[in-house]
Amino acid sequence: MKEPSIPDHLSPITHHGLAFAIWITGLPASGKSTIVSALKPQLEGLGLTVEVLESDEVRRVITPIPTYSEAERDLFYRALAFTGQKLVAHGVTVVFDATASRRLYRDFARSVIPRFIEIAVECPLTTCMERDRKGTYQKGRQGESLTVPGLQSPYEAPINPDLRIDTTTTPSGDAAREICDLVTAKFL
């Protein structure tokens, strides 16, 4: 799929004070949401107003009966990035808790949100499958879903993330502290 151009009204916004965006990406059940749960209060402890945009929650509004087609995913992640951009523009720090299986999705967000960091949550697929409480991988293995990242659909891991976190060795609280240290050094 060809990368779309950025409309003028989505050009990067530069008047946003201290706000920034963090995209936490990784395979389903890799530990993204667990890290985000530990991260949000730590960021708030730094005096930041924080909003988490969790993909499953937002998807229920944007695509209530998802097909996970390429076109639908592109629309969804562009809408998610747009929402994040608007929040950052109004001084709200945004944490994206979303697989965003293609680099293109995350790169689009980076292009419209200047103060942006990408966190790669790394975990072997077998461990993700063992941790999977939502049944995502089971549906994929049983043929009920044909677009599970890591199974039928590729997951494009970040090439140069701002931080890599191995959730098989790093507890969520430690991961959140590492992210806060990075944010403090980079933005605060």
Where are these regions (language model features)?
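Extreme N-terminal, non-catalytic leader segments
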Residues: 1-21
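C-terminal accessory "lid"/substrate-recognition subdomains
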Residues: 2-3, 45, 177-188
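Hydrophobic anchor at the beta1->P-loop junction of P-loop NTPases
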Residues: 24
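The conserved Walker
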Residues: 28
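Conserved lysine of the Walker
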Residues: 32
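Conserved substrate/cofactor phosphate-moiety recognition/catalytic segment
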Residues: 37-85, 89
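Glycine-rich phosphate-binding loop used to anchor ATP phosphates in small-molecule kinases
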Residues: 71-117, 121, 138-139
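Small-molecule kinase domains that catalyze NTP-dependent phosphoryl transfer to phosphate-bearing small molecules
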Residues: 122, 130-178, 187
